[in-house]
């Protein structure tokens, strides 16, 4: 996929974060203002009419997949000024992109004629005489468009990332849209922004280019569970015994985080985002015993799937695809 993209420059942005949108703590602004009865995303969902979908994209044709991790909001901090080791900085360089790079990539794939499609439109589960299995569907696309799936690994906002120039969580603002919470590493000012995080950036890009989405499709969050999801610490701590004096306070905090993330999940689903598993513990599936995989899968379903809903999508951590049929 990378060969399809234009060069994205170095690991800096012109302002290193100075162009962020600073708002009140509830995320109020004037973007996408609508009345109480109209969802602005309706215009995206309905942009392509059925009679415009004249190009068949068959099962033998490639559907490109472009994946990201959370993007770096403050590259100067991440690559030069934070306390990360050199190896950690190399890791950021290998696996992450900056806000500036991300914006250029979105513009590049859009300019090349790609359109976002939903994974469930590409594949279907069928049961026939040979059993239950997945089959590729034929997509109907606008003439001249090519299908693209975008996914984001580890949108959990792990604590280590908060010290390395990333945003910290997703929230729903007063405008009903998704914002990111961010703390400026130089001033310690905490604010909401739509300009420094991959999720609201893609949201805004699709609002501005509704032809970039087929039937309102957006992207997939590939989530672990061991440090919560979407910036909320929803994970259980099984090291705290049921009769521990620390248990009531932990359970109360976890319950508050679970309630806080629910409206975020709801709005993401309403606006074309879907969810997949990256395993609960980010484990290598090709090296773990089957029972470990079963236990991990059950814990993901209990702590993550119970919030985002069931999924048929699994993203292999470390590209560790297991062999065999288990």
For every predicted segment, state its role:
Residues 4-7:
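C-terminal motif of bacterial Sec signal peptides marking the signal peptidase cleavage site
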Residues 39-94, 151-156:
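Boundary/entry segment of secreted carbohydrate-active catalytic domains
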Residues 9-37:
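Short, low-complexity, disordered segments immediately C-terminal to signal peptides
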Residues 31-32, 60, 136-137:
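Residue-level signal for protein termini and structural transition zones
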Residues 66-78, 129-134, 141-148, 155-322:
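Metal-dependent polysaccharide deacetylase catalytic core of the NodB/CE4 family, i.e.
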Residues 97-136, 256, 305:
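C-terminal domain-boundary segment and adjacent tail
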């Amino acid at each position: 996929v990378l060969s399809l993209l234009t060069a994205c420059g170095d690991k800096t942005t012109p302002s290193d974060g100075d162009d962020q949108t600073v708002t009140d703590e509830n995320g109020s602004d004037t973007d996408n203002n609508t009345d109480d009865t109209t969802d602005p995303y309706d215009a995206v969902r309905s942009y392509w009419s059925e009679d415009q979908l004249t190009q068949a994209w068959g099962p033998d044709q490639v559907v490109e997949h472009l994946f990201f991790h959370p993007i770096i909001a403050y590259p100067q901090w991440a690559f030069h000024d934070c306390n990360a080791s050199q190896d950690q900085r190399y890791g950021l360089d290998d696996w992450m992109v900056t806000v500036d790079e991300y914006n250029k990539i979105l513009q590049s794939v859009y300019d090349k004629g790609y359109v976002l499609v939903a994974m469930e439109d590409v594949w279907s589960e069928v049961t026939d005489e040979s059993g239950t299995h997945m089959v590729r569907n034929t997509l109907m696309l606008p003439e001249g468009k090519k299908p693209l799936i975008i996914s984001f690994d580890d949108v959990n906002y792990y604590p280590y990332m908060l010290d390395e120039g990333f945003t910290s969580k997703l929230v729903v603002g007063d405008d009903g849209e998704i914002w990111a919470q961010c703390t400026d590493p130089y001033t310690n000012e905490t604010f909401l922004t739509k300009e420094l995080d991959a999720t609201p950036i893609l949201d805004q890009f699709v609002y501005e280019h509704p032809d970039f989405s087929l039937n309102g499709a957006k992207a997939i969050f590939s989530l672990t569970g061991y440090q919560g999801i979407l910036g909320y610490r929803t994970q259980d701590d099984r090291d705290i015994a049921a009769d521990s004096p620390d248990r009531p306070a932990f359970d109360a905090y976890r319950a508050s985080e679970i309630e806080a993330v629910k409206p975020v999940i709801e709005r993401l689903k309403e606006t074309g985002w879907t969810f997949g598993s990256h395993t609960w513990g980010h484990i290598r599936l090709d090296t773990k015993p089957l029972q470990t995989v079963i236990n991990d899968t059950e814990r993901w379903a209990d702590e993550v799937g119970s919030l985002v809903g069931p999924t048929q999508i699994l993203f292999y951590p470390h590209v560790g695809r297991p062999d065999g049929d288990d």
